[in-house]
């Protein structure tokens, strides 16, 4: 009996010690001078943009594995408000909508996550992710400090925080960055609104991770907040140095990141499938990696916009196809493409001594 008690005491001690060590050994991510820092060491984000809503849940794990085998170290994803709150006050984060499960799957394969909760996300999605029922209030002004709009955004952000804030890196999860709004400079100029969205993101629980805002290089300064990281969006064929020129002038010590490097483009009904040359995409990524510039490849896998969730463009009304193939490295059906092979061969060169998983 005495030996058993001693054994149990020793077992409890080692379990307690192991828990303490696990807590003290948690990873860290921060924004340093000229570089991101992961566990205190320079880190280049190589992110794959994928959307959980456009991939049937049984295939989530496969697509994440494909991104890992490509050579990516991070997943980037939007949170689509209107699919989680299809009716006012009724939230659904189960099944296909279980974003926490998606992030945990990414962590299973050693991948970090960048979350982009909007509230507006664009993404060629119905109303840019904003719920239809907001328009029942006839005088509402979307993406402004409209009291009703901001009230509903706050409620939504709190629900997202319940799901994802526990998964921040500082909490033992894998979320390293969270975006505030989305390309707002192409919509308007309203720093008070952006500031309010930032505050809602923080109060929803995302107060242990880096916050950032993204925009095109031509207008990112219109709403840029001093306390947020700034990133720029551009696509295949762009002049890398020119895209970052203004940002480097304003913030010479900031880490550089292309938060959306467009691998292809979206398709409209009645038009030809959009494509972009694989060699141009790969060259653009090489140019960034040679400069230690982080990137998120939008899209790495586009998938399918199921149901009636496809959006449309204005002022010349033009609807999106249900296919969101995007001419991405991983095809709509989840297949390897020539883009995938070329990019994988490139990324191997920037991970000396690391063997990529088999495809």
Specify the residue positions occupied by each region the protein language model found.
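Bacterial N-terminal signal peptides
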Residues: 7-17
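Aromatic-lined substrate-binding rim segments of carbohydrate-active enzymes
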Residues: 60-126, 198-209
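Carbohydrate-binding surfaces of carbohydrate-active enzymes
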Residues: 153-164, 171-179, 190-194, 207, ...
